[in-house]
């Protein structure tokens, strides 16, 4: 809530049928939050779409519950989007709980060739190669702003007018892959996705969601 102190924001929490008292806790401690309590697990895409459809802001920020942001993260992201009219989506530098950089902060489009290089370890062997390192764009400086192909669903800011053109998250993706699909549609609509490392977030479950399985790739 502190991160929204200087931002005109509406906050939605979508609960996918949790059983740990989260719904009641949010209602009690954060009465200003608009909560959607689902009776079953709708999946990532559908749950986020529920909130997006109710949102009224110029920008939409999708943010996982296992993240921690800096107090000025949202301000910096909004300033960047305001200054770059070509930006359809924006992602930030993500680190895990130990402070380690999460490579999924910036990704290329996982074409069959790019996915092959990742699955067979070539991207790890040659991270600085523009040929083999495209999956995580590992040849790009992690401390500089870059145009990228794919935003991470854990934290992605999207211009609302762009969503009007691309459509919302594809609900045929229950979990994983929906961020790739939407990122691709953003670029196909003529906008750019940017990696913005001038602020960072902690993503505690980043290591468990590296999505390195063959099914995901």
Residue spans for each PLM region:
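Short, acidic, metal-binding catalytic loop of nucleotide-sugar glycosyltransferases
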Residues: 1-8
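A conserved acidic beta->alpha catalytic loop
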Residues: 7, 15-24, 40
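Glycine-rich, basic loop-to-helix element that forms the pyrophosphate-binding segment
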Residues: 37-55, 76
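Short aromatic/hydrophobic "clamp" motif used to bind/position activated sugar donors
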Residues: 60
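Active-site-adjacent helix/loop segment of glycosyltransferases
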Residues: 95, 184-217
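Short, flexible, basic/aromatic active-site loop/helix in glycosyltransferases
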Residues: 109-148
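A short, conserved alpha-helix in the catalytic core of glycosyltransferases
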Residues: 141-200
């Amino acid at each position: 809530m502190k991160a929204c102190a200087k931002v005109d924001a509406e906050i939605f929490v979508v609960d996918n049928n949790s059983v740990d008292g989260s719904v009641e806790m949010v209602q009690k401690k954060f009465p200003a939050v608009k909560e959607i309590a689902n009776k079953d697990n709708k999946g990532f895409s559908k749950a986020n779409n529920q909130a997006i459809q109710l949102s009224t802001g110029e920008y939409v920020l999708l943010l996982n519950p296992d993240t921690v942001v800096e107090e000025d993260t949202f301000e910096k992201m909004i300033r960047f989007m305001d200054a770059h009219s070509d930006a359809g989506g924006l992602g930030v530098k993500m680190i895990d709980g130990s402070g380690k950089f999460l490579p999924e902060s910036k990704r290329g489009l996982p074409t069959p060739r790019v996915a092959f290089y990742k699955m067979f370890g070539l991207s790890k062997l040659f991270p600085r190669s523009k040929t083999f390192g495209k999956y995580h764009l590992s040849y790009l400086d992690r401390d500089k702003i870059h145009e990228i192909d794919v935003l991470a669903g854990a934290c992605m800011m999207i211009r609302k007018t762009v969503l009007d053109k691309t459509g919302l998250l594809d609900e045929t993706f229950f979990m994983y892959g929906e961020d790739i699909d939407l990122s691709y549609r953003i670029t196909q609509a003529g906008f750019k996705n940017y990696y913005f490392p001038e602020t960072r977030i902690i993503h505690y479950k980043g290591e468990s969601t590296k999505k390195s399985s063959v099914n995901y790739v």
